[in-house]
Amino acid sequence: MENQSNDISKCPFHNGSMDNQAASGTKNNDWWPKQLKVNILRQNSSLSNPLSKDFDYAEAFKTLDLEAVKKDLHVLMTDSQDWWPADFGHYGGLFIRMAWHSAGTYRVHDGRGGAGAGQQRFAPLNSWPDNVSLDKARRLLWPIKQKYGQKISWADLMILTGNVALESMGFKTFGFAGGRADVWEPDESVYWGSETTWLGGDERYNNGSDGVPKDHGVVSADDDADGKVHSRNLEKPLAAVQMGLIYVNPEGPDGNPDPILAAKDIRDTFGRMAMNDEETVALIAGGHTFGKTHGAASSDHVDKEPEAAGLELQGFGWKNSFGSGKGADAITSGLEVTWTKTPTQWSNNFFENLFAFEWELSKSPAGAHQWVAKNAEAIIPDAFDSTKKHLPTMLTTDLSLRLDPEYEKISRRFLENPDQFADAFSRAWFKLTHRDMGPRARYLGPDVPQEVLLWQDPIPEVNHKLIDENDIKQLKEKILNSGLSISQLVAAAWASASTFRGSDKRGGANGARVRLAPQKDWEVNNPAKLAQVLSKLETIQTEFNASQNDGKKVSLADLIVLAGSAGVEKAAKDAGSSVTVSFNPGRMDASAEETDVESFGYLEPKADGFRNYRKTKSAVSTEELLIDKANLLTLTAPELTVLLGGLRVLDINADGSKNGVFTHRPGQLTNDFFVNLLDMNTQWQAVSNDKELYAGNDRSTGQPKWIATRADLVFGSNSELRAVAEVYASTDANEKFVNDFIKAWTKVMNLDRFDLA
């Protein structure tokens, strides 16, 4: 549109006809809500990162005066601000909740969530109903973050602040490790649930809570029980009972104040965060030793969450019109509970009160279900008036620790043995706040505890001389002369390395746990064939190590990766390309005693599109599961594409099928997968009722050519993936394909090599 007259009154920008410009209007996702979310493979690029490309957070953290930061945090704890005054004159309870809710989003099934990237700063977490008032906690921290700049990330600072809060109130913590680098945008890969209302649970459970209207529902009290308790079969990978909660509803299931039923929710959700019963009791009781909840009045007084609040609030949300809107008038959860007589001092008073009184159901001023002690005196201090005392109160979920038989045994033991309680809480708190950091190799700082814990997936430190280039060459020759095929070598290496999850940094080739339970028995690894490969590689390892006289050794973990790399080189050579796959020795072999079988069970892939494997049917499509797997492997869309295409022609399908093996020369590293997938002479049609298998027939003659899965055809169907596939299908692409495949392959093999970084 052109304004020929130069009359500004006719300019569409100034007259409102072009008010909505870049990134506005109806989006692709509005038209096609089930469109494949390839976008999760291009998160956290340099385009969103304001720091220089050569910034190394680990190196920056090493220059931090951690003691000075902790000293400043100690001062902050009792430096009450008029704009958000501290309960009992101490911010400890608020900061413990901030750290807990930062870490507590972690879940074991996919390793996502957790404190590792400072996601509490971004939507949706910054606006969850369970995070009301944590906007204030982070703003209280801003002067300290501002002072130390990029030497400490928000992710580390939030957890450190929780530790200092505990220490400032007389508790000895287990330790602290830095190393959590910030990201600069929300993580779009996390599935938080399908509900479209806050506090909804109708999708994650059968007949669950409907939640509350979108423009309201900022506290759990808004979701009141209707007397029905739905099926408690929580959807995986979720670890929270309702949309916008961290774990459980403190009033009980869907607001039903039943401590026994609540215990079932607690056990399920805390278990999905990797906590056993003892750790769960310790965490709840330890956290509730401090501070209070806030429910001074109805949530009708509370305005919109941060992401929906006005510009003038500058990132604050939940503006409260009741009284002063702060201090004694604060509204957070809608509950009004202070658990102990000394809410700013570590004690055993939580358990003392829990068992000393009988409890009757009551309601907070906001209308939330809570419990009050019967026949008790007012012994609980007021947060802002030293002349006031209150009756002891508890949450429904607190009473679960007394009324659930298993929790009750642990709680009584902690009541009678305060030292055991303190030790259990210190360990559980450390696990809570460090669970998603991965191996100890990532831990930074002087406060890292020396004790090695099983949940850290320990791997022995290198205690021998590493192999050199000549050794690598000789070992490759032995591997290629062992009788093992290229596909066997590549498949074993992929099975070992592809367990890595970028979410919680677990899994990977280091440790060679592919030879141990449970991984050696996973269906996706084709146990019988895997055992053959490992047996021959172990023989090569034993012979090599026995032949050395200078202390040099090769670990099986290194040898598995080296074997895969040798297979890739041979496959490229057989296709006419002379290449070298880079290899860095230094992996070690973990023992069965260093491996938590149950915990590693969560790493078993329900689907691995790279091996054309899918274990069970689910509501999630095969292609969505492929994107999810690629995201966990930290792959970009081009890396996903070139890797899958290369692995197909290398013939490593889990079941040995020819699905997607679009080549007449399997075992050679060629771009045949892409050439044949995009061949217009092939016509595809579903050959299974579930549309998981497709036949590719000659368009002219009808003669069968190929069999494919959804994980194959998506590279011709999805417009973004097809655009990449076309690059690798081009006649000039062979060299690029081989080089890009090797680069992506090496990346996966080294995903857990934090020592190389």
Curated annotation (Swiss-Prot):
The record marks R97 as: Transition state stabilizer. It catalyses: H2O2 + AH2 = A + 2 H2O; 2 H2O2 = O2 + 2 H2O. Binds 1 heme b (iron(II)-protoporphyrin IX) group per dimer. Formation of the three residue Trp-Tyr-Met cross-link is important for the catalase, but not the peroxidase activity of the enzyme. There is a cross-link at W100-Y247 (Tryptophyl-tyrosyl-methioninium (Trp-Tyr) (with M-273)). There is a cross-link at Y247-M273 (Tryptophyl-tyrosyl-methioninium (Tyr-Met) (with W-100)). One of its GO terms (molecular function) is catalase activity. GO terms for biological process: cellular response to hydrogen peroxide; hydrogen peroxide catabolic process. Keywords: Heme, Hydrogen peroxide, Iron, Metal-binding, Oxidoreductase, Peroxidase. Gene3D superfamilies: 1.10.520.10, Peroxidase, domain 2. The active site is at H101. Its cofactor is heme b. Coiled coil: none annotated. Residues 1-28 are annotated as: Disordered. The keyword Disulfide bond does not apply. Heme b binds at H288. Pfam families: peroxidase. GO terms for cellular component: cytosol. Its EC number is 1.11.1.21. Homodimer or homotetramer. Bifunctional enzyme with both catalase and broad-spectrum peroxidase activity. This is Catalase-peroxidase.
